[in-house]
Amino acid sequence: MQIVIPMSGFGERFRRAGYSVPKPLIEIEDKPVIAHIIDMFPGESNFIFVCNQEHLNKPAYRMAAILKEYCSSGRIVGIPPHKLGPVYAVRQIEDMLDQTRPVIVNYCDFTCYWDWGHFKQFVRDVGCVGAIPAYQGFHPHSFGNTNYAYMRETGGWVQDIQEKQPYTSNRMQEYASSGTYYFATARIMSEAFRSAMEQDLNVGGEYYVSLAYRPLLANKQPVAVYPLQHFMQWGTPEDVAEYNMWSRAFRQLVATTVVKSQTMGTVIVPMAGLGQRFAAGGYSLTKPLIPVSGQPMVAQATHDLPPAEQHVFVLRSDMQGHREVTTELTRLYPKAIIKTTDQVTEGQACTALIGLDAIAEELGDVPGPITIGACDNGALYDLTAFRSLVGDPDVDVIVWGVRGYPNAIRHPKMYGWINAKAGVIRSISVKTPLDSPTSDPIVLGTFTFRRAEDLRRVVERLIDRDGRINGEFYIDSCINDAIALGMNCRLFEVDSYLCWGTPNDLLTFEYWQSCFHKWECHPYGLEKDARVSQNTIDFLKFRYRATCPALPALMK
């Protein structure tokens, strides 16, 4: 296979974001992006790298040396800087191609999990003049604002393709090109590229490979879709940051096994919400029992809270699966207090107060510190650092937070934001972002109070002043009351925030768990993850197994 990789663009977005090397040389998983692209084609040696000559000329980039390190047989061609797109770049090296042999043009800002051998067999069996690897359905990067090349298809055959905009309002249900483009011969590619430029098929002055299929489709030539299981998008600084966040989290899940021996204080887990989004999404189990890594969600969430002497869980009596949840919690935490409320509360702060009252009634004195945590998220953090903060007698309240969480950046009005300096919290802004959502910390929904009476005081003060946000009393808001009462409130930043609070949150976690488990470039594996229930590993391996697409339907 002849493989051409146009990499002559400027990468302005990365430059503006502070990156010091061109996009193909940015390191991800300990090697440059271009190395991941080369790895997509195991056993191949006929590569042509079409580079920006200015990049080749800059000694600090070492572009030619890096390309030779990862592909010694590759041919490196420098062309003058331009803004005409990848079709123009590839046309500069057309005379280097065997016009009778197949060719792939591959962009330089992504990778995917696929079977290269299967793809080659697929195009041979199908007999198409072109094929486009693409993804459809749930892929987390599609939640961003970037649009790609989208296709109309019938039975696996492309009917139309357009750049930078979907055909419908539900782009996840459309096939989007990954950035790999196959042509049965280089001659077919060259003629398609020439036609595309003659017809002025460009977007913003750039000629994209996707649009070169339009002349082929107009002539009723068969172009197939090749569905992909996992796709890693690194086209923008935001894409890279989000990918790295998930990669770090799953690396940390298998890096060390934390032995939580010393227990202290109380953990209260409010779980009196309705969980309507999961029910609407077709989940039959009530939210706390939905499996995460083979364990009930509430068990995974509680596992990530500090080891405690006493646990309190607050449930609604009319919660679907109330009996099953109670049975499971009793099995996991035999000494736990399970408090039932007969109605939906007015918010997390009120539910936490119910839990505090329950343990006070049971034990009299409430063991401190008291940590309130949600039933639908986990966190990876330095337990020693947390205990050091708890051990500081000057600290009254600890607010758990994290920076750079992608969903908060996309939807800043859905989160609480922490205004802190040198770890000391000045205020909490609930559902209203601060100056810089990309770097300001958000509230996880986990809080630690040194004394039970302080928790009670701030919640009662919040209720007295009717400090509702969107009709609910949030513990986020209580922190402002704590500050007003003179309490020393400190920020505790976690390493990774694992959110399962909505169906999309859970699907995103499972997407990356599935991808990293299979992908040899990542160290994660289900069998290495101590949070994965041992008796469900085989089930999860089967669920996450590699898939290869079937052949398309016969063309009519």
Where are these regions (language model features)?
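Short glycine-enriched, charge-decorated loop/helix-capping segments at active-site entrances
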Residues: 19-25, 197-199, 283-289, 463-465
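A structural signal for short hydrophobic beta-strand segments in well-ordered beta-sheet cores
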Residues: 25, 150-153, 225, 289, ...
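Alpha-helical elements of Rossmann-like donor-binding domains used by nucleotide-donor carbohydrate transfer enzymes
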Residues: 91-92, 118, 212, 242, ...
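Conserved core of the sugar-phosphate nucleotidyltransferase
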Residues: 113-200, 379-466, 545, 551-554
